[in-house]
C-alpha cells in the first residue's frame, strides 16, 4: 500500500535573490514612471507583494534602495569585445558591435527614463548621478581605452590619445542622442536608427 506523505504547509520559500530582484524591478519602474516622491518604501513593498519588514531585510532606507537599483541596472551590463581583431577590418567590425551593444543598453526606454530622473531635482540626486556616471560612462570608456591601446600594440592602429578618443567615440554615439531622447525629440531605441552615428564615430580611427 502506497504511503501518503503529508504536503508541506505554507508557501514555498522564495530565494532571497528572487525577492531582491523583484524589489529592484518594482523600484526601477516606479522611479521612471512616477518619479522619486512616489517611490516610497511602502509603495515598493505593496507593488512587490511583500511585507515592509521583509523589504527592510534588503535595504536600510529609501536612499540605500535607490543606490542599489541604479548600481544593479548598470552592473547587469558589462560591454566587452567578443573576438580578437587580426586586421583593421576586423577591428572596425568589433568596435561597431561594441558601440551597438552600449547604445542598445544606454539608449533604451528604461535608460532614457533613468537619465530623465537623474536630471530632475530630488534628495540624494547628486550622489546617485555621480554613481551613475562612474558606473556607466567610466566603465565603457575604460574598456574601450584599454582595447584600443592593445590594438595599437598589435600594430593595427596609429598612435593617438586613446583615452580622449574613447571619450569622443562614446559621446558621439550616446551623449547627444540621449539628450534628444530625454527631451522627446527622438524616440528611444530601437525606434531610432543609431547606425549612422556609430559609423561616424568609428571613422575617427580610420587610417589616413
Task: Show where each model-derived region lies.
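Amphipathic alpha-helical linker/stalk segments
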Residues: 67-98, 106, 110
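Key DNA-contact positions within bacterial/archaeal DNA-binding proteins
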Residues: 53
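Amphipathic alpha-helical packing segments from all-alpha helical-bundle domains
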Residues: 109, 113, 117, 126-153, ...
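Basic, helix-initiating cap at the start of DNA-binding domains
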Residues: 1-34, 38-47, 58, 63-64
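Helical hydrophobic small-molecule/effector-binding pocket
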Residues: 93-120, 124, 174-177
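Hydrophobic/aromatic-rich alpha-helical bundle segments in the mid-to-C-terminal region
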Residues: 152-201
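Amphipathic, non-transmembrane alpha-helical scaffold segments
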Residues: 16, 20, 24, 70, ...
Amino acid at each position: 500500500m502506497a504511503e501518503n506523505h503529508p504536503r508541506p504547509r505554507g508557501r514555498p520559500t522564495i530565494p532571497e535573490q528572487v525577492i531582491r530582484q523583484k524589489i529592484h524591478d518594482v523600484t526601477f519602474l516606479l522611479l521612471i514612471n512616477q518619479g522619486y516622491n512616489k517611490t516610497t518604501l511602502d509603495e515598493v513593498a505593496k507593488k512587490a507583494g511583500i511585507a515592509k519588514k521583509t523589504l527592510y531585510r534588503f535595504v536600510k532606507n529609501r536612499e540605500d534602495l535607490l543606490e542599489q537599483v541604479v548600481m544593479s541596472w548598470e552592473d547587469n551590463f558589462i560591454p566587452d569585445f567578443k573576438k580578437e581583431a587580426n586586421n583593421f577590418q576586423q577591428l572596425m567590425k568589433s568596435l561597431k558591435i561594441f558601440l551597438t551593444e552600449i547604445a542598445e543598453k544606454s539608449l533604451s526606454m528604461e535608460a532614457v527614463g533613468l537619465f530623465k530622473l537623474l536630471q530632475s531635482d530630488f534628495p540624494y540626486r547628486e550622489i546617485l548621478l555621480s554613481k551613475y556616471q562612474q558606473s556607466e560612462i567610466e566603465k565603457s570608456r575604460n574598456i574601450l581605452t584599454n582595447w584600443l591601446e592593445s590594438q595599437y600594440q598589435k600594430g593595427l592602429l596609429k598612435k593617438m590619445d586613446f583615452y580622449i578618443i574613447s571619450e569622443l567615440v562614446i559621446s558621439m554615439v550616446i551623449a547627444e542622442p540621449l539628450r534628444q531622447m530625454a527631451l522627446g525629440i527622438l524616440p528611444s531605441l530601437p525606434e531610432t536608427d543609431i547606425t549612422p552615428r556609430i559609423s561616424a564615430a568609428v571613422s575617427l580611427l580610420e587610417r589616413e
